[in-house]
Amino acid sequence: RGLGDVYKRQAYAMGSLFFGSNPNLVCGIVLEYSVPVAVTAFMWISMFGGNGPLALTIILTSSVISPVTIPLTLKLLLGATVSIDVPSMMQDMAFMIAIPAVLGIVINELTRGWGHEKLSPALSPACKFMMMGVIASNSTAMSEYVLHMNAVRLEVALFILTFAISGFVVGFLVARALHLPYSETTTMCFTCGMRNISSGAVIATQYFPGEVVFP
């Protein structure tokens, strides 16, 4: 949680430093690091022998509190330069992220693990295709900016790539500093480095100009 707050502030500070003349780009950069931890991080954590229960706890916690943290973060950091409908965004985030996460927990508890052991693997392929569809459909909002690429947008892309990689590095360094075992170090790396970009794309498309989707 603490690392997440630090990263949001760093994203805002560095975004403002390099791209402060364009509030839409700064908004997109901050939004990128305000969304919850990516659900797909759990898949990578499992593949590399990470701590599954810890990963699920981090992912679900960040998802459940996101209807509050995302709008408030954007309002606090960008409220002076970008118009933000906080109540409407909170409502949409609750239905899009928090409620599905809570329902998943409830179903798994009521079925005594059947949801995780049987239902989740069965639905996983379809969910991946649907996720790709959501990302693709919402990414059309930035097609104009990709087709008309300029030096500033190339700089934004390079910045996002570098900042994203740094998330994995910071997670690793913090885990090593705390002398965490391999499984928890792996979990820290992926949960610090991966964000739910599909939800970010939906938020950007619904509430902001198309250029916000680009970062």
Regions found by a protein language model. Give the residues of each.
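The feature identifies polytopic integral membrane transport proteins across all domains of life
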Residues: 21-33, 50-60, 86-88, 118, ...
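Transmembrane helical segments that form the transport core of multi-pass membrane transport proteins
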Residues: 119-188
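Membrane-interface helix termini and inter-helical loops of multi-pass transporters
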Residues: 15-23, 75-88, 113-117, 142-155
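Interhelical loops and loop-helix junctions of multi-pass membrane transporters/channels
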Residues: 21-41, 58-63, 72-95
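Short, small-residue-biased leader/transition segments that mark boundaries at the very start
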Residues: 2-7
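Transmembrane alpha-helical segments of multi-pass membrane transport proteins and ion-pumping complexes
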Residues: 8-16, 38-42, 66-76, 96-105, ...
